[in-house]
């Protein structure tokens, strides 16, 4: 099976991509473009010559190659992004029958498939936040935005969290009512949102089309009347599908965020739990989501279509920002009204920043593991670690498992503080001999980051996120070249251990 990456790699050359028969099966390549092909391509656009047999045969051969290539590419998209994402890419990205698959079309179709599949590395995680949006196309088609907080980390399904924030008016609005404040209505889940985003007329046409195709399949095409043949041509478009209750709905664009703290892949319940340092604060978001719902019950909050604070997009953004989205990307409010398109763009920016930082964090982790491959570095670091267990975060797990007593929590914070001081002192000692011509800009940046980003018990989630970001990005700039000495390697390991202390403080901050 040819991968999406293989198509993208060939398309980067800017020419038409084709699928041919290789020694080991179908293979993707760039179409041959010699003098003959260039001549026929030119003649196929000349009115007086394009109907010549030779030119027509060439044009038909190209269209056949393009159709086959598109079919294989859609199969590759389906394997990577699922049938729904591949169908969306075909519906919105393929356009003309027999059109060439070039760099622009490959990029466009991959982008569409990603949007329908969902964007974000947190999609398989047990603890995640999902931001959903349906495109706004003006007041007649305003779209929608909603947010769901999910926690399926516990083995007991009865303790799973599913908090859905979906802000609607209690009746259909139109005209001047778009500026009025009306009573709000909260939807219970994503499935109800999907049903609400498909019109009654479209739903009726989809049902008629499905029924007509079933009848034609059972009775035969020659027995179908004109109305049935007409209805049978009405197929669902990308995103339109039946749910398990046989109700039609329209799928949303989805953006996935990880929750800060211990997390794991929900597809592998026996897999290891890892601490996610960069993400959203689940507890803070749950508090705000419940405050919003309580405000709807008491009448404190209303729904207003044209609003910066009380429409669907602004409410979804409010809960997203309550989780710390602005720790990653500053938020700028709309001048007149928030809308699902702006909300989606902001959610994408936050997701991209969070995923990039978590990827850098993983890169630093792997680099430090390689540094410990040196016997001398490993021995020196083991001696330091055994003296104070500085290289890990053993108490962070305890903090993440529930609320501890005030005395236990304070003892834990005091131990974290002692480790921070010990790591800082070790880093300063390792840096003492690096002065003058032996100290370059990278050394100075790392020393400055260690000084400014040492965590403390006074730090909240925002401060800890900022400090972790600076340390991770500073260390990330050191990964391209091997350290020149054991001392440099140990300095990097000390900085990595400081990130471990930030994790420990973060676990306490989100559990408090």
From Swiss-Prot:
Record-annotated disulphide pairs: none
Location of the protein in the cell: Secreted
Transmembrane segment boundaries: none
Pfam families documented for this protein: SicP-binding (PF09119)
Taxonomy, superkingdom: Bacteria
Regions annotated as coiled coil: 347-374
Keywords, alphabetical: Coiled coil, Secreted, Virulence
Primary subcellular site in the record, as a coarse category: secreted
Gene Ontology CC terms, in alphabetical order: extracellular space
InterPro entries with a match to the protein in the record: Globular_prot_asu/bsu, SptP_N, SptP_N_sf
UniProt region (Disordered), positions on chain: 388-415
The protein's role, per its UniProt record: Plays a role in mediating bacterial evasion from the host autophagic pathway.
Family per similarity comment: Belongs to the BopA/IcsB family.
Record-given protein name: Effector protein BopA
Name of encoding gene: bopA
């Amino acid at each position: 099976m040819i991968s999406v990456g293989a198509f993208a790699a060939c398309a980067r050359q800017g020419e038409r991509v084709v699928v041919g028969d290789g020694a080991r099966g179908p293979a993707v390549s760039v179409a041959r473009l010699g003098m003959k092909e260039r001549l026929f391509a030119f003649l196929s656009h000349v009115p007086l010559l394009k109907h010549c047999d030779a030119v027509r045969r060439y044009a038909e051969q190209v269209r056949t190659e393009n159709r086959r290539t598109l079919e294989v590419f859609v199969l590759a998209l389906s394997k990577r992004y699922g049938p729904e994402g591949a169908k969306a890419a075909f519906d919105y990205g393929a356009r003309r029958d027999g059109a060439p698959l070039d760099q622009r079309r490959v990029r466009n179709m991959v982008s569409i498939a990603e949007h329908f599949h969902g964007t974000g590395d947190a999609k398989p995680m047990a603890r995640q936040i999902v931001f959903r949006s349906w495109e706004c196309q003006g007041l007649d088609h305003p779209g929608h935005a909603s947010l769901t907080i999910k926690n399926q980390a516990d083995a007991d399904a009865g303790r799973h969290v599913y908090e859905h924030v979906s802000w609607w008016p209690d009746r259909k609005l139109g005209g001047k009512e778009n500026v009025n404040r009306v009573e709000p209505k909260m939807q219970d889940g994503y499935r109800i949102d999907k049903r609400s985003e498909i019109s009654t007329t479209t739903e009726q046409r989809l049902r008629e089309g499905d029924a007509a195709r079933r009848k034609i399949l059972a009775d035969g095409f020659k027995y179908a009347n004109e109305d049935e043949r007409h209805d049978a041509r009405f197929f669902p478009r990308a995103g339109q599908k039946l749910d398990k209750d046989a109700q039609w709905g329209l799928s949303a664009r989805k953006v996935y965020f990880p929750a800060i703290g211990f997390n794991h892949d929900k597809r592998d319940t026996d897999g290891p739990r890892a601490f996610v340092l960069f993400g959203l604060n689940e507890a803070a978001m749950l508090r705000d989501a419940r405050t919003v719902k309580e405000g709807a019950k008491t009448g404190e909050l209303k729904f207003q279509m044209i609003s910066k604070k009380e429409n669907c997009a602004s409410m979804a953004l409010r809960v997203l920002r309550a989780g710390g989205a602005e720790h990653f990307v500053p938020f700028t409010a709309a001048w007149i009204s928030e809308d699902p398109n702006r909300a989606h763009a902001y959610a994408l920016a936050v997701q991209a920043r969070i995923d990039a930082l978590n990827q850098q964090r993983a890169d630093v982790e792997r680099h430090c593991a390689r540094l410990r491959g040196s016997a001398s570095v490993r021995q020196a670091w083991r001696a330091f670690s055994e003296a104070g267990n500085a290289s890990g975060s053993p108490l962070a797990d305890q903090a993440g498992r529930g609320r501890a007593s005030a005395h236990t929590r304070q003892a834990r914070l005091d131990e974290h503080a002692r480790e921070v001081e010990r790591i800082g002192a070790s880093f300063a000692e390792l840096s003492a001999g690096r002065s003058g011509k032996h100290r370059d800009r990278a050394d100075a940046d790392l020393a400055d980051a260690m000084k400014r980003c040492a965590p403390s018990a006074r730090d909240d989630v925002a401060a800890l996120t900022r400090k972790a970001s600076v340390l991770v990005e500073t260390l990330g700039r050191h990964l391209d070249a091997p350290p020149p000495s054991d001392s440099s390697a140990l300095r990097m390991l000390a900085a990595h251990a400081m990130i471990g202390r930030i994790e420990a403080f973060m676990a306490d901050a989100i559990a408090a």
